[in-house]
Amino acid sequence: MKSPIIYVCAALAEIAGCFAFWGWLRLGKPVWWLLPGMLSLAAFAYLLTLVESQAAGRAYASYGGIYIVASLVWLWSVENVRPDRWDVTGGCVCLIGAAIILWGPRG
């Protein structure tokens, strides 16, 4: 049951790492932003290896839903852009899909 917690931590690491590149290339932030960005992306990759899954592809697929919702939280909390009803609806659909992949019975 620790997988959802790992996914949330991985999502924060991935989004922060990608945002460092976004900041450098699109917002004019200094090049040194890339160092914490790369460390954050390395932490993201490491965290996904800790997920309880027998197949990497399944771990990545179920992570996708968490990533999408975490991106919407980032949108609101860091970029000060409130998600609209379509963002929220899409996020809910993605979470349902991630739950099916993560906890679906395997035969």
UniProtKB/Swiss-Prot annotation:
Subcellular location as annotated: Cell inner membrane
Transmembrane annotation, as ranges: 5-25, 31-51, 59-79, 85-105
Keyword Lipid metabolism part of the UniProt annotation: no
InterPro entries: UPF0060
Membrane topology term: Multi-pass membrane protein
Keywords: Cell inner membrane, Cell membrane, Membrane, Transmembrane, Transmembrane helix
Cellular component aspect of the GO annotation: plasma membrane
NCBIfam families listed in its UniProt record: PRK02237.1
Family: Belongs to the UPF0060 family.
Protein name in the entry: UPF0060 membrane protein RPD_3084
Source organism of this protein record: Rhodopseudomonas palustris (strain BisB5)
